[in-house]
Amino acid sequence: MPRALEPEAAWEAVQLGLAEILDVRTEIERRRYGAPPGARPVSLVKHMASPEGPGSIYLCQHAIRSKVTLRRGAAEVAGGFAAWMDAGLPVEEVD
């Protein structure tokens, strides 16, 4: 899997069951903007030392925080959640 996936490619991988989106944004960000369907909220600090394995795609608001995981060979959504929204991909409300 490429290390930086365009939002559409990340969503396709999720729909095919090949990947899971790990959302490293804060709870405030998730509540304010929503989240991709099925995205799992995770702590970036906990995952910096040991990112999840293949099939994990990290997502932050603007693809800045998620770059930390790239150094460990993980994948990220290129452009972050902002690019996800710009692409018109599905978003769920977060309570």
Spans of model-derived segments:
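Rhodanese-like catalytic fold shared by cysteine-dependent sulfurtransferases
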Residues: 1-20, 27-57, 62-95
